[in-house]
Amino acid sequence: MAYRAGFVALIGRTNVGKSTLLNAILKEKVAITSPKPQTTRNTIRGILTTEDYQIIFVDTPGIHKPKSKLSEFMIEVAKRTLKDVDLILYMVEPDTSIGPGDRYILDNLKEVDTPVILVVNKIDLVPAERVEEAIKVFKSEYNFKDVVAISASLGTNVEVLKEKIVSFLPEGPRYYLDDYITDQPEKLIVAEIIREKMLYFLEEEVPHGVYVEVESIKEREDKEIVDIDAYIYCEKESHKGIIIGKNGQMLKKIGQAARQDLEEFYGKQVFLQLWVKVRKGWRDNEKLLRKLGYAIDK
């Protein structure tokens, strides 16, 4: 049996479960997950390598109407991804009608030649009849190569989906070494873990107006300890107060939760220090967005 390797895009509306699926397949926390929309900013590659195949997953930001330079970047990344991969997984919820968000995505899919598998997620939340009806509705709009109904959070049919993905991969050598799980820089992984905790603990408006910049990551020579210094930047003074919280309790809660995940990631004790600063209008600052890795090459 020839070795197979290829790139697979995860695409869909915000919050349909793309990152949850990626993490379930890889058994590692690679993509940031949260119940709030627009939580994935960077194109994150999760890499699954076996003796027979290698799948490089590209987890795109959700497509939505742009409201800032940052969201324009997110949408441009998602649209370009469609043309640069071997297979697209189009993830939807079991809706019995197609809303404007999915209509916009379907229109974009019709502009590319890449094969598409329809992945209907969250089947554990609705009756089977509704799942079947949703599949009929979406199949009437697009000629999908295959359809798989799953529950990413429970792992239902995830292995079935994995087998179907492999069948679409081209024959060829692996792109990454066996022990690679993601090609994200270390500081980006740390920053995303911290930002994920803010998404869980803070009010709806605040987390999407923040970014995390990791100043330093140092391993102590004499002890099994990793020292991490990071800055949380927000757009408003009022947001700074919310992030810090009364007597610093909210920042402490964010730091403790992030530290637990970071200690699991590093396999050793982590000493995490967080600071909060205000940087007004950062989401429309092209120079800063480019520095943070959000810029699109024209």
UniProtKB/Swiss-Prot annotation:
The record's section on PROSITE patterns has: G_ERA, KH_TYPE_2
Q: Where is this region: G2?
A: 38-42
The record's keywords, sorted A to Z, are:
Cell membrane, Cytoplasm, GTP-binding, Membrane, Nucleotide-binding, Ribosome biogenesis, RNA-binding, rRNA-binding
Query: According to the UniProt record, where is the region G4?
Result: 121-124
| Residue segments, region G3 | 59-62
Binding of GTP, residues: 12-19, 59-63, 121-124
Assembly, per entry: Monomer.
What is the documented function of this protein? An essential GTPase that binds both GDP and GTP, with rapid nucleotide exchange. Plays a role in 16S rRNA processing and 30S ribosomal subunit biogenesis and possibly also in cell cycle regulation and energy metabolism.
This one is known as GTPase Era
